[in-house]
Amino acid sequence: MNQTIEEKNKALVLDAFETLFYKRDYQAAEKYWSPNYIQHSAHIEPGRDGLFNLIRSAPDTLRYQHQLIVADNDYVIVHGRFSGHGPPVAWIAADIVRIENGRLAEHWDVIEDEARRESSKSGLPTFGDHFTG
């Protein structure tokens, strides 16, 4: 059975994130990120090197967990949690990635601190089905 472009792109993004965030294999990660990678995040220096340098500078305890991934043609959105990066609370992010020629070519994100039970006006967690900690 043939995969749709959306299925292929979701798998590509998850493989790329695992290679960079978990394995920290920068040489292998180069095959996933375009050398002309465009970075729109206000939190990350420009280009592929900006992202790779950010991860190099992050503590070894950095962890990324995705919860939801959706795709529309060459765009993939991943809802995830970054933890172990230093601040007392995790970050919840929606990462939007554009794929071009089988590589991550462009990135946008929205990041917020993970809500704690006492600060969640909705009474619901911002990631997963339960509060952490």
Where are the regions a protein language model picked out?
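C-terminal and inter-domain tail/linker signature
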Residues: M1-G133
